[in-house]
Design a protein with these regions (language model features):
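Conserved phosphotransfer microenvironments
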Residues: 51-72, 79, 83-85, 89-95
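Conserved phosphotransfer cores of two-component systems
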Residues: 44-45, 69-76, 104
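Acidic, metal-coordinating helix/loop segments flanking the phosphotransfer/catalytic sites
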Residues: 33-49, 53
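Output/docking surface of receiver
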Residues: 12, 33, 85-127
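Alpha-helical interaction/dimerization surfaces of two-component signaling modules
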Residues: 21-23, 41, 100
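Two-component/phosphorelay signaling modules centered on CheY-like receiver
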Residues: 13-33
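CheY-like receiver
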Residues: 129-133
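Nucleotide donor/acceptor-binding cores
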Residues: 4-6
Length: 133
């Protein structure tokens, strides 16, 4: 890919900042905090990748993923699911998120909240690079 990729980050404010820091200069980021804002961006801008966190828009990541994959103009955009900030979810639920995300059309689920910071950054950057290929 020659042009700088445009990455839509769908996350609560703190997680969006963490992702931008983690991903560095991998792309141009557009950060949104609600599903409505995300679809406005998708309607008016070319997006190469969507990265969403579990807690996006009051924990609507899966709902957003299903909506994106059901929208003809956006279904082709790779969608990467993640958990950036540890929360109240039980380990068993978080462990099932990867399967749920992939079943709904995501390319992967990266649980960076469980990883040491250096490994988390490496894993997320690798997942983004792979998703953009």
């Amino acid at each position: 890919m020659n042009a700088t990729p445009r990455i839509l980050i769908a996350a609560q404010p703190h997680a969006g900042q963490v992702l931008q820091t983690m991903l560095g200069e991998i792309g141009d980021f557009i950060v949104v905090h609600t599903t409505a804002d995300a679809f406005r961006v998708l309607e008016h801008q070319k997006i190469d990748l969507i990265v969403s966190t579990i807690a996006f828009d009051e924990s609507r990541m899966l709902e957003f993923l299903v909506s994106v994959k059901g929208t003809a103009s956006a279904a082709h955009i790779p969608f990467l699911c993640s958990r950036v900030v540890a929360g109240a979810l039980r380990d068993s639920l978080v462990g099932s998120m990867g399967d749920a995300c992939k079943a709904c059309g995501a390319v992967d689920f990266i649980d960076v909240a469980r990883m040491p910071p250096d490994l988390a950054q490496t894993a997320m950057r690798k997942a983004v690079a792979t998703s953009l290929q």
